[in-house]
Design a protein with these regions (language model features):
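Extended extracellular/luminal ectodomain segments enriched in beta-structured repeat modules
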Residues: 243-248, 377-380, 390-402
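Flexible, small-residue-rich N-terminal segments that precede or flank a structured functional core
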Residues: 327-390, 409, 428, 444, ...
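Intrinsically disordered, low-complexity segments enriched in small residues
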Residues: 5, 30-91, 214, 221, ...
Length: 599
């Protein structure tokens, strides 16, 4: 009996102790009203800190991409759609540096040597020289000629120079160029501003030395010439500010180790002695101040003793009816195939199609129109990623986005709508050659799109001019990385709204290729290789092999074996042999056990 009563007593004590532990603290609070109640923090007031960029991870560079370490321990892989690095003599990736430095002896502004590439601009036009682009042992030097020089060069041996005509048969009426015109080096754009406070932004990720721009004012009355060195390319813009008697412009291209040939699409390809395409000049187009554009501009070439005369001729009827200034846009591009989409090996292809011009191909344009407009009709943008950004083996994708820059020009946001919703869709059509498919695509033969599923949308307003807009692609990109043959192609469509279509036609102008604000494809990931504090593991002893860790989230196995250590109050250290299951490969020769690294 005594034992039974004692057991009951113990049970009561334990029950009371348990009740005291789980009772709310307020039950024991003092009744003294002078003690203020504890401040309650609303959930809305608790915000996660912005994820900023700590710095670049140089070891993970590629020709067109960079990797950045983020403040939360994750990483960001960025593809710029064009080369931003070159390999040095040691095989290491270095930033392309187009910063201009004045060289007194050459009387020129010269970029750094980016591997085999270098570009130079004349300080003035006293000798008619404009710019030189060199790649290895080959080069192209561009210059102007006074009418007397031009007539002498183009005249038939039996013809009087005064009777000479241009390659397209027109009289040579071009005025003298302004030999006193001096170069103006334009201010470089604000780029690569890595911040940990406000979070990362697409406009802050552009490499800071990728481009430089110079301007020659009043080369001809009412005509300026602007040149931009970006990546490995040289872009020229003929800026016509007022009406002219003629819209024909002749340039002497002195070629070293190169020969020129006109292509069926109106472009010019420069090949070396082995037949390799070194440079190309895409078929030109022109655009006025209101955004109206035309392809009524063409090239003709005529071989001369030390190169070619390249004649650019624009349709006077179109130019005279346009809103000035009118910009005529030829570009000298490294390794060209077709137009401004550069090369079939490039990491990104961007173009658009318009219902208002259903048979027109727009792949030669530097910019893309999205929305609804009077000239192009309904505009769809297409983006193909020619391969996904490289991420380390074993890493997990946590986010992805595609970002495009909205032009600051007067037609950057054009129309009556206060806002323009743009939706992102997956392209369902696959192709054996996406490059050829897209450079020959018009509205009538556009790629098929899954319009039943909106992946993401963004709403654009006038305030977005001069900034990047973006779309979240996380779910789709995860599928791409898991697939063996993904299409890696998306389309950007305006929202379908009858009232919007009828009354509020609006388009935006975003850049498909630009030296300062190229499209940015960004993939966020976490590197799960090794032991990370934000994951949980099942830990077990592995005897002499060390300690084994099995990741709860991924199932990856890690084994850590300490091989050396030094105890010190000043600078202690340890060296571990780390096995990661994701690194395991079958190999007949290795300096470490298969799947292992030194940490």
């Amino acid at each position: 009996m005594k034992s039974s009563r004692f057991t009951k007593f113990i049970s009561i004590v334990l029950t009371l102790a348990l009740l005291l532990q789980i009772a709310p603290l307020q039950a024991f609070a003092t009744t003294d009203e002078t003690v203020p109640p504890e401040e309650v923090v609303e959930a809305a007031e608790i915000t996660a800190p912005a994820v900023g960029v700590v710095g670049e991870v140089d070891d993970l560079r590629s020709e067109d991409g960079k990797h950045f370490r983020l403040s939360d321990g994750s990483f960001l892989s960025v593809s710029y759609g064009m080369p931003v690095h070159y390999t040095d003599e040691d095989g290491q990736w270095q930033d392309i540096d187009n910063t201009l430095t004045f060289q007194q002896g050459a009387d020129s502004y010269v970029t750094a040597e980016n591997g085999e590439a270098v570009t130079a601009f004349s300080a003035d036009l006293s000798k008619g020289h404009l710019a030189t682009a060199a790649w290895g042992d080959t080069s192209v030097s561009m210059g102007l000629m006074q009418p007397s020089q031009l007539r002498s060069i183009l005249a038939d041996p039996e013809e009087d120079a005064a009777d000479a005509v241009s390659p397209n048969g027109e009289p040579l009426l071009q005025p003298d160029y302004n030999a006193d015109a001096a170069v103006e080096v334009e201010a470089a754009p604000a780029t690569m501003s890595l911040s940990q406070e406000d979070g990362w932004k697409a406009e802050d990720l552009m490499p800071e030395k990728l481009s430089s721009t110079v301007l020659y004012r009043d080369v001809y009355p009412g005509v300026d010439l602007r040149y931009t060195a970006f990546s490995y390319n040289l872009k020229e813009q003929i800026i016509v500010r007022e009406k002219q008697d003629s819209y024909r412009y002749d340039f002497l291209l002195e070629l070293k180790g190169l020969t020129a040939k006109m292509q069926e699409d109106g472009s010019v390809v420069l090949r070396d002695s082995e037949g390799n395409a070194v440079y190309g000049i895409p078929a030109p187009y022109m655009e006025d101040a209101k955004g109206a554009s035309s392809t009524a501009v063409s090239y003709t070439i005529q071989e001369v003793e030390n190169g070619i005369v390249l004649t650019v001729t624009a349709d006077p009827e179109w130019v005279n009816s346009a809103a000035f200034p009118v910009t005529i846009d030829p570009t000298l591009v490294k390794d060209i195939r077709i137009a401004e989409m550069y090369d079939g090996d490039d990491p990104m292809f961007v173009t658009f199609v318009g219902s208002g011009t259903p048979n027109t191909i727009y792949t030669q344009r530097q910019h893309t129109y999205l929305g609804y407009g009077s000239e192009y009709g309904e505009c769809w943008g297409y983006v193909h990623f020619n391969g996904l950004p490289n991420i380390p083996q074993g890493a997990v994708v946590t986010g992805a986005s595609f970002n495009m820059y909205v032009s600051t020009s007067s037609n950057g946001y054009s129309g009556n709508a206060p806002e323009l919703p743009l939706e992102l869709y997956a392209v369902t059509e696959t192709s054996n050659n996406y490059f050829d498919r897209m450079v020959n695509m018009s509205w009538n033969n556009r790629m098929k799109v899954d319009t039943d599923t909106v992946l993401d949308y963004t709403i654009v307003t006038k305030n977005d001019q001069g900034h990047y807009i973006g779309w979240d692609m996380t779910g789709l990109v995860k599928q791409w990385y898991a697939s063996t043959n993904p299409s890696t192609t998306v389309a950007i469509l305006p929202a379908q709204d009858k009232d919007f279509l009828a009354n509020l036609c609006t388009t935006i102008k975003v850049f498909a290729y630009d030296p300062e604000v190229s499209p940015i494809f960004a993939v966020e990931y976490r590197n799960n290789v090794g032991i990370e504090p934000y994951y949980t593991y099942n830990t077990m002893g592995a005897g002499h092999a060390g300690a084994a860790y099995l990741a709860d989230a991924t199932g990856q196995l890690k084994v850590v074996k300490e091989v050396a250590s030094y105890a010190s109050s000043v600078n202690p250290f340890s060296v571990n042999l780390v096995y990661n299951s994701d690194y395991f490969v079958s190999s007949t020769s290795a300096y470490l056990p298969h799947g292992s690294t030194m940490d």
